[in-house]
Amino acid sequence: MGRYAIEPENPAKSCKARGEDLRVHFKNTRETAQAIKGMHLKKALRYLNDVIEKKQIIPFRRFSGGVGRKAQAKNFKTPGSQGRWPKKSAQFLIQLLRNAESNAEVKMLNTDALVIDHIQVNRAAHLRRRTYRAHGRINPYMTSPCHIEMFLVEKDEAVPKGEDDTAQKKKVSQKKLKKQKLKAALSGGAD
């Protein structure tokens, strides 16, 4: 079992999944992972399935050189509304999310309350091939695989704030207090 970059705060309420040397583009996978970070598990799976069907888009923020502008990307705060639909990256992330979900079921966690707390994509070792060019030359033909790690945390439901019986007093600055006193003194002197 490999090491994770960080460990969850409460291991009993979390589940992990990781994949190493995955034959999928690093840059596309990194952008896809950032798009689902912080989402609930069910919402992330639905979103990634929509990406595969091109109903929703992945905004490209860091690795956006040469990425075309799409109307769907306007919904995100993306500079230049750049985005793509990285199908293979979405499929790999769906597999990892399903793996994490089954790990959560083994640990008896509530899968409806799982949130993606940590997801990280690292570069893996390049796979080297060659392509043959004109005049007897040979050029490298490299692939950029990646490692993916994630953990999901079971979030507790937010407790609503209790209402106070006493109304809290508004804080008033010194300048406003002086103005109020001056007004009171002037209006009191007129009577």
Swiss-Prot record:
Organism listed in the record: Suberites domuncula
PROSITE patterns in UniProt: RIBOSOMAL_L22
A GO-annotated cellular component: cytosolic large ribosomal subunit
SUPFAM superfamilies: Ribosomal protein L22 (SSF54843)
Gene: RPL17
Matching PANTHER family: 60S RIBOSOMAL PROTEIN L17
GO biological process: cytoplasmic translation
InterPro entries recorded: Ribosomal_uL22, Ribosomal_uL22_CS, Ribosomal_uL22_euk/arc, Ribosomal_uL22_sf
Family recorded in the similarity comment: Belongs to the universal ribosomal protein uL22 family.
Annotated protein name in UniProt: Large ribosomal subunit protein uL22
Coiled coil segments of this chain: none
